Amino acid sequence: MAQRPSVPIAIIGNYISRRRQVSLEEAEALAQGLKCRFLGEVHAIRDGPYSYADGTLESILNLYRDAFFGDFDSETGEHRKEKEFKGEVLSSGLKDIAKQKRHKLANIFMNPKPPKYRSSTSLGGIATGCSPRSVVGVGGGNRCAHRPVCCTDNKFSECLPL
């Protein structure tokens, strides 16, 4: 069994639609800025050797303190169906894992007009007010101190507590 790392992991990408919100380089820079380990795009977990449907995502979350989910630019957000914002299997499953395993998770969705993120109903209003190109998660490292943060302007030079 793999050892749990001493720093949080940042999993940044688009979980549902396969469209990247940020480039891999930008995501990796964000992870480094937060003193997190960068795993890659979230859809690699869904479609690759790991799957939340068969329990391997839960196994991964058992190994890491924090998981980041960056989600959706405004163009993609406009095409999402309303049912995806309700407590579907994905978000409620993550909520259950967070509750059972005490992982800090932020799985956020964007409301494109006006440009803000909104969270799924099952995870509460963590990300209200973030810009459309920001990434929201539970931070690691000194600046974020394991609190929900909004890293803005695609520069990722600061983490702002919500």
Curated annotation (Swiss-Prot):
Q: Name one GO molecular function term.
A: structural constituent of cell wall
Induction text:
Expression is light-dependent and positiveley regulated by the GATA transcription factor nsdD2 that binds promoter regulatory sequences containing a GATC motif.
Subunit record text:
Self-assembles to form functional amyloid fibrils called rodlets. Self-assembly into fibrillar rodlets occurs spontaneously at hydrophobic:hydrophilic interfaces and the rodlets further associate laterally to form amphipathic monolayers.
**What does this protein do, in the record's words?**
Aerial growth, conidiation, and dispersal of filamentous fungi in the environment rely upon a capability of their secreting small amphipathic proteins called hydrophobins (HPBs) with low sequence identity. Class I can self-assemble into an outermost layer of rodlet bundles on aerial cell surfaces, conferring cellular hydrophobicity that supports fungal growth, development and dispersal; whereas Class II form highly ordered films at water-air interfaces through intermolecular interactions but contribute nothing to the rodlet structure.
Write the record's keywords in alphabetical order, separated by commas: Cell wall, Disulfide bond, Secreted, Signal
The source's domain of life comes to Eukaryota
Q: Which InterPro entries match?
A: Hydrophobin
One cellular-component annotation, GO = extracellular region
Know the name of this protein? Class I hydrophobin 3
- Tell me the protein family, please: Belongs to the fungal hydrophobin family.
Q: What is its main location?
A: secreted
Give the disulfide map.
Answer: 36-150, 151-159
This protein's species is Coprinopsis cinerea (strain Okayama-7 / 130 / ATCC MYA-4618 / FGSC 9003)
| Subcellular location as annotated | Secreted; Secreted, Cell wall
